[in-house]
Swiss-Prot record:
Pathway: Pyrimidine metabolism; CTP biosynthesis via de novo pathway; UDP from UMP (UMPK route): step 1/1. Catalyzes the reversible phosphorylation of UMP to UDP. Allosterically activated by GTP. Inhibited by UTP. The lineage of its organism: Bacteria, Pseudomonadati, Chlamydiota, Chlamydiia, Parachlamydiales. This is Uridylate kinase. Belongs to the UMP kinase family. It comes from Protochlamydia amoebophila (strain UWE25). It is found in: Cytoplasm.
């Protein structure tokens, strides 16, 4: 691409904050990620971030063990608040202007999400970290990312994952899985490709927000700018070419 998007929504899983400790939040991992975020901000790009909470808690796990879905999801949403605060403090240590806006009211630790205020912050160059998911149970943080991207009129949604794009099968389980360079929203939905849930994909399609799926390792290599200049580093989801396949995994 010849120019950078004006405004980006970056979706991070809670797992990006684990580092090498297997659970929770590792400060070094936070600092490495925030260096990539700082790099993007220095390009003049307005940046919003939605972060998951799976490194701390997954509501769906408690539901499987008998807890009602609603309180289980509330606990998962609160986990994203912890991650957001950790990310905010790491950004502050790099002197990056940032704020945490929560879909759940926790006024002593985060601002309540307000659409107009979020837009104002973005225009002022503040990195806005959106936590609390959508504020409602039964919705994933991927859906929250698509919702916030739609609300702030993001030009691109970046999703960091464990693999370097979208494959026709799980590449962590099948070494013959084939990667797509580019694929349409409709094909992702039709083939039920497990990159984001269907609600999130449909929201992005309805609001014409391209999705770029890339390997979270780029965040730790300070190479997020490469992702924005060369789409071969992942998979682009939009209404363009129907997915053509890239090379098989070299393993």
């Amino acid at each position: 691409m010849s120019t950078f998007p004006k405004r980006i929504l970056l979706k991070l899983s809670g797992e990006t904050l684990i580092g090498n400790q297997g659970f929770g939040i590792q400060q070094q991992a936070c600092l490495q990620i925030t260096k990539s975020i700082q790099q993007i901000q220095q390009l003049g790009i307005q940046l919003g971030i939605v972060i998951g909470g799976g490194n701390i808690f997954r509501g769906i796990n408690l539901k499987a063990n008998g807890m009602p879905r609603v309180p289980a999801d509330h606990m998962g949403m609160l986990a994203t608040l912890l991650n957001g605060i950790a990310l905010q403090q790491a950004l502050i240590s790099l002197e990056v202007k940032t704020c945490v806006m929560s879909a759940l009211d926790c006024p002593k630790v985060a601002e309540s999400y307000q659409w107009s205020k979020a837009l104002q912050y973005l225009e002022e160059g503040v990195v806005v970290i959106f936590v609390g998911g959508t504020g409602n149970p039964y919705f994933t943080t991927d859906t929250a990312a698509a919702l916030r991207a739609s609300e702030i009129q993001a030009n691109l949604l970046l999703k960091a994952t464990k693999v370097d794009g979208i494959y026709n099968q799980d590449p962590l389980k099948n070494t013959q899985a084939v990667k797509y360079d580019r694929i349409s929203y409709s094909q992702v939905l039709a083939e039920k490709l497990q990159v984001m849930d269907a609600t999130a994909i449909a929201l992005c399609r309805n609001h014409q927000i391209p999705i770029f799926v890339f390997n979270m390792k780029r965040l730790f290599e300070n190479r997020l700018d490469h992702v924005l200049t060369d789409y071969s580093h992942g998979t682009l989801v939009d209404d363009g070419e129907i997915g053509h396949e890239a090379n098989k995994l070299d393993r």
